[in-house]
Amino acid sequence: MTSHGEEIEDEQISRIEKGNCKDSQGGMETAICSSPSIVCLTQKLIAEMIGTYFIIFSGCGVVVVNVLYGGTITFPGICVTWGLIVMVMIYSTGHISGAHFNPAVTVTFAVFRRFPWYQVPLYIGAQLTGSLLASLTLRLMFNVTPKAFFGTTPTDSSGQALVAEIIISFLLMFVISGVATDSRATGELAGIAVGMTIILNVFVAGPISGASMNPARSLGPAIVMGRYKGIWVYIVGPFVGIFAGGFVYNFMRFTDKPLRELTKSASFLRSVAQKDNASKSDG
């Protein structure tokens, strides 16, 4: 049996696929932020490209600076930089494109019917373009030595790196699903929550795999620098982890009602039960 809410969601998705988007008050949120007005696809693609560009430029750039200038940034500084730039770009472009910046996130949103499939290849193309341009910019700006490679390669075995990428990608998408697609969450804090998750993930998995969580983050530097060692890890790992994170959260989310509505209903039922018990005792 199909619920009324599911019927409404299917209708909204059909409108989006036809280009008839609805705003955040009456429509479906497709990612980190929702826009109050219709935004043409070209603007969304430009926002995705610019957002991905500055994420790669800042995150990978700080890695290069740290190596070339004697470790002045330090590992904690690198972790914080990645989280901050993701947070900044979410708040800067989320209301335009949804702030995916990640092919695996885009595909997962589409799989769970929160993003139109026809836009998926266009979004992925914009994300890869942003990553390639940022990587090319860094190569032109700095004398990038093999030691200062700003891509991602497994530190030890590919198996260890794969496990690390799956776990941290799972956590990333689990958080994104919670703060971006659940109407009960506080959407204004989405950027902070996702940024903090990035910081934690880089702290934990950075020494093992480089903490990519994003095929675009790894493919751009690999293509520009011509280094493809273990690149499959950074395609398979994020896709598996992000899909699993989205699946688990969607499995857990049993209702779309805000918490205040659930608590009101619970209070009402308790009052009815108390009155019923009181009437029985009087009788």
Curated annotation (Swiss-Prot):
Modified residues (Phosphoserine): 267
Membrane-spanning parts: 51-71, 77-97, 120-140, 161-181, 189-209, 231-251
Subcellular location: Membrane
Gene3D superfamilies referenced in this protein's UniProt entry, alphabetically: Glycerol uptake facilitator protein
Short sequence motif named NPA 2, residue ranges: 214-216
Residue numbers bearing the N-acetylmethionine modification: 1
A GO term from the CC aspect: membrane
Membrane topology recorded in Swiss-Prot or TrEMBL: Multi-pass membrane protein
Record keywords: Acetylation, Membrane, Phosphoprotein, Repeat, Transmembrane, Transmembrane helix, Transport
Keyword Membrane: yes
InterPro entries assigned to the protein according to its UniProt record, in alphabetical order: Aquaporin-like, Aquaporin_transptr, MIP, MIP_CS
Function text: Aquaporins facilitate the transport of water and small neutral solutes across cell membranes.
Homology family: Belongs to the MIP/aquaporin (TC 1.A.8) family. NIP (TC 1.A.8.12) subfamily.
UniProt cross-references to NCBIfam families, sorted A to Z: MIP
Name used for this protein in its record: Probable aquaporin NIP4-2
Organism: Arabidopsis thaliana (Mouse-ear cress)
Lineage, highest ranks first: Eukaryota, Viridiplantae, Streptophyta, Embryophyta, Tracheophyta
Designated gene of the protein: NIP4-2
